[in-house]
């Protein structure tokens, strides 16, 4: 198994970790399994537990027992191997006395010039990626716990790197959905660029010699065979940002475009203001995954403590993100957009707790913003021609008999023909999720007109009738002036369905709705004359 961790020799942990739990609970059992790459897949191994014949044949993965408590303790005596300088800490970590897959702790001090953290690396042979529907990966129950370990931080670990996963080894359904649309796109679960600021971390002087002068933080990229351009090039481009440089083990590619360099520079500069004090120790990904094919969509992902930012450019990328977001939130309801996040200075982007994507048609800038922080950056980029589709949402409502194919609501009798109350709630949930297809950053007035009738969230002959009557868009009841009102502040706790910001004679539309009943409550409050937006 390729999994690396610091030895912790002479290391005092005085800082307090800002932890961000993922959406999976940590397994209570102590005999959690760790997934590893088997160097001899054809041989029978008693340690390969839970891997059946077909899966074992096609995946070349082995399951090795590793107690969770042992990973958390990270005993220094269990580290018995050092990575060589010539391999940049990625290869050459095998002890002749023990097989490669038996390792769980390997120090990278010699490779990067300082103590690092645990890096679970789940490898897969470089082959043509097989469809996920071929195999069911339910036997790999420990992959979510691996992410949690890297997030929470064992008490003896100092810093944390990313995680390498093959395309076909991730068992989570919510991750399969976006990967069908964006191949191995980064998410809060997946490999990420992780930034942590530590005070009194006790970094040795030799580590500071390899990093920018006067800095004491770090930025580490993930290693993933299927990363897109920003994930694998951002670290090299950080050398163009102020007060940062690339270590001697690599250099910036000569054919790197100026726009990508600017994006990386702005991200590095902006995050350095948040992480105090700033530091950029850059570790390069393997050269064998660079460069990536030209013309691939670009998704910029950055993270700082509990702040996430995903900025996407190119029409196909932005379009796919908008299709993915409601599905992601359906499986992870806790990752909801913050109400009232949009403001006039950020009208060119669509933002939520999970992603930031520029989607204004014919836009010449990609604007990125950290969630919960006033940071706003911009850099020249490609054109974004991402118009929000409405046909799919209207089609879903038509299938459920809530409206016609033209977008008009159906009669009450048609809406009340439902066999069970569960069908009512399920269909209402599907509709609230499908509204994101139409409302999220919709710029076309015709599309908004077709979505003016928000379907009833209740039916006359079911207990769900208590939610109220038919909800229509605010324009029908309050006129077009409501769309030019400024978004509410988070303290007000209101949920707007559609937000429009006027700029240079053009209105940009946004949606910040998570549930239909939230919009209904907001509309009820807006019925009062003194609260009506003008």
From Swiss-Prot:
Belongs to the intron maturase 2 family. MatK subfamily. GO terms for molecular function: RNA binding. It comes from Selaginella uncinata. It is found in: Plastid, Chloroplast. The lineage of its organism: Eukaryota, Viridiplantae, Streptophyta, Embryophyta, Tracheophyta. Residues 29-95 are annotated as: Disordered. PANTHER family: MATURASE K (PTHR34811:SF1). This is Probable maturase K. One of its GO terms (biological process) is mRNA processing. The keyword Transmembrane does not apply. Usually encoded in the trnK tRNA gene intron. Probably assists in splicing its own and other chloroplast group II introns. Keywords: Chloroplast, mRNA processing, Plastid, RNA-binding, tRNA processing. One of its GO terms (cellular component) is chloroplast. InterPro entries: Maturase_MatK, Maturase_MatK_N. It holds the Pfam family MatK_N.
